[in-house]
Amino acid sequence: MSNVRSKICGITRIEDALAAAEAGADAIGFVFYAKSPRAVDVRQARAIMAELPPFVTTVGLFVNASRCELNEILEAVPLDLLQFHGDETPADCEGYHRPWIKALRVRPGDDLEAACRHYAGARGILLDTYVAGVPGGTGEAFDWSLVPSRLSKPIILAGGLSAGNVGQAIAQVRPYAVDVSGGVEQAKGIKDAAKIEAFMRAVKQA
């Protein structure tokens, strides 16, 4: 049985958040990026969080948000963890009194250990698929052999994961956690409870 943690990202509906919690997800993610088909506003996020059972970590995903915008959201939504998914510098990620992780879009030749050191304050590094001009949510997997066997920060593996490949991904990369969005959807922003359950079962059996 795997002890790899899991996050279901791109939650937009209460029923999807509850399905994730029921299936055993450790965290759910809210996308505060207006260009995403999975974007939520403050009102939606608050309503969903009000229905969550305890011990489910709430993560806010941001893409090059201004400090003013991010502070306004944090005043209204009590997020547990921040995920920076754009071109943010380490300084951009600090100062919010929340733990944070930094997403990197992986390309051949990237020095991921150098990136871990660069984002020294991050609690973990999320590795996602590189597609030019797209910050994330591509639904495509990347070449997992690009991930070194040892890195100095916990690794959250994302990018094209599903119930069909997450077991292989865990076996190959040995991440701290996995992150899924499109792989458990029936449409963008609309999750499928059966796919969530199948994904979580595959994670636990890995």
From Swiss-Prot:
Listed CDD domains: PRAI
Keyword Zinc included in the entry's annotation: no
HAMAP family reported for this sequence: PRAI
Organism listed in the record: Pseudomonas putida (strain W619)
EC number(s) reported in the record: 5.3.1.24
Pfam families named in the record: PRAI
InterPro entries: Aldolase_TIM, PRAI_dom, RibuloseP-bd_barrel, TrpF_fam
Protein name: N-(5'-phosphoribosyl)anthranilate isomerase
Enzyme class of the recorded protein, top EC level: isomerase
Family to which this protein belongs: Belongs to the TrpF family.
Entry's Gene Ontology BP terms: L-tryptophan biosynthetic process
SUPFAM superfamilies registered for this protein in UniProt: Ribulose-phoshate binding barrel (SSF51366)
Record keywords, A-Z: Amino-acid biosynthesis, Aromatic amino acid biosynthesis, Isomerase, Tryptophan biosynthesis
Catalytic reaction equation(s): N-(5-phospho-beta-D-ribosyl)anthranilate = 1-(2-carboxyphenylamino)-1-deoxy-D-ribulose 5-phosphate
Pathway: Amino-acid biosynthesis; L-tryptophan biosynthesis; L-tryptophan from chorismate: step 3/5
GO MF entry, a single one: phosphoribosylanthranilate isomerase activity
NCBIfam families (UniProt xref): PRK01222.1-4, PRK01222.1-6
